[in-house]
From Swiss-Prot:
Disruption phenotype: No visible phenotype under normal growth conditions.
Gene from which this protein is expressed: WRKY25
InterPro entries, sorted: WRKY_dom, WRKY_dom_sf, WRKY_plant
Residue numbers spanned by region Disordered: 217-242, 277-303
PANTHER family assigned: WRKY TRANSCRIPTION FACTOR 25-RELATED (PTHR31221:SF229), WRKY TRANSCRIPTION FACTOR PROTEIN 1-RELATED (PTHR31221)
Lineage: Eukaryota, Viridiplantae, Streptophyta, Embryophyta, Tracheophyta
SUPFAM superfamilies, per the entry: WRKY DNA-binding domain
Post-translational modification: Phosphorylated by MPK4.
Compartments, record wording: Nucleus
Gene Ontology MF term list: DNA-binding transcription factor activity; metal ion binding; sequence-specific DNA binding
Purpose: Transcription factor. Interacts specifically with the W box (5'-(T)TGAC[CT]-3'), a frequently occurring elicitor-responsive cis-acting element. Functions with WRKY33 as positive regulator of salt stress response and abscisic acid (ABA) signaling. Plays a partial role in heat stress tolerance. Functions with WRKY26 and WRKY33 as positive regulator of plant thermotolerance by partially participating in ethylene-response signal transduction pathway.
This protein's name: Probable WRKY transcription factor 25
Amino acid sequence: MSSTSFTDLLGSSGVDCYEDDEDLRVSGSSFGGYYPERTGSGLPKFKTAQPPPLPISQSSHNFTFSDYLDSPLLLSSSHSLISPTTGTFPLQGFNGTTNNHSDFPWQLQSQPSNASSALQETYGVQDHEKKQEMIPNEIATQNNNQSFGTERQIKIPAYMVSRNSNDGYGWRKYGQKQVKKSENPRSYFKCTYPDCVSKKIVETASDGQITEIIYKGGHNHPKPEFTKRPSQSSLPSSVNGRRLFNPASVVSEPHDQSENSSISFDYSDLEQKSFKSEYGEIDEEEEQPEMKRMKREGEDEGMSIEVSKGVKEPRVVVQTISDIDVLIDGFRWRKYGQKVVKGNTNPRSYYKCTFQGCGVKKQVERSAADERAVLTTYEGRHNHDIPTALRRS
């Protein structure tokens, strides 16, 4: 190609440069061969000169090509970093490259090391505090540190009440009634310990489940140590076809009458108030004192009995199925009275041991629920053995 002067370049027309565009050809794929060479007449040099390379900025030394491939927008969620759109945790780096948080221009929000501990601190502690607020402080005080002789009223919620309401103390039921503010009947109990004024109210549902217990007054004594009740296997066997029973061989105990029991049932104490709900409203105050009751029984037999207040003889109740009313137990008895009590149409007979100096008594009556069942209540303990004449027979 011949050299061309600067004057020729200025004289050439822009149209002439492109009039033979069909003769242009591309040589190779490099930038040097991108512009065609003219055949025939010469092509201006500035049209054949290679253009300078494009300015490409260098990437940061902290980034590699694999870092771009690890972008959350290019890869699946299994290789992506945690973000508002993916929500996943980072795995191992792409192509074996491991990246640190300091290598990235953005910083990830730190997550708690133990999610379960965070939840426990948020919810577990709050739930524990709520339960502590629901449990009355007086309940723990009553079980561990008794405040003797103090008047207080404690209401226990339903979720803390056990089915048999056994709290370690001896209780005697003296009444039951239906209150307006509750659909369940309420039973009233008094502590059996002498001179103790503590009482409790037990609310029971129709299915037998205890729904509420209310304590009134504090105990002025520690919890009694109960002895084990005699099992049915320890009852005396029959002699000459007749069933014998010796109350002196049985260790009686105070008991909670909220528990169902056919062996021990303080039936005589229910005379005054246990069935008053069928005839009228119940007064929550205790019935006449024990001393007055025993004096009344002593007047029936024509003799005076002086009993110190607070002394209560043990009671044992035996239920048998028999056609006869009197239970043959080996001792001699003398009948001194009979009457009909409320709640039972069958009469109750009163007997006293004929041995000189023995104050044991018994009451015999048929059950109101079952006419064949005979209830024999023994009060006191014999201070003598079975008479010899009866023992030989």
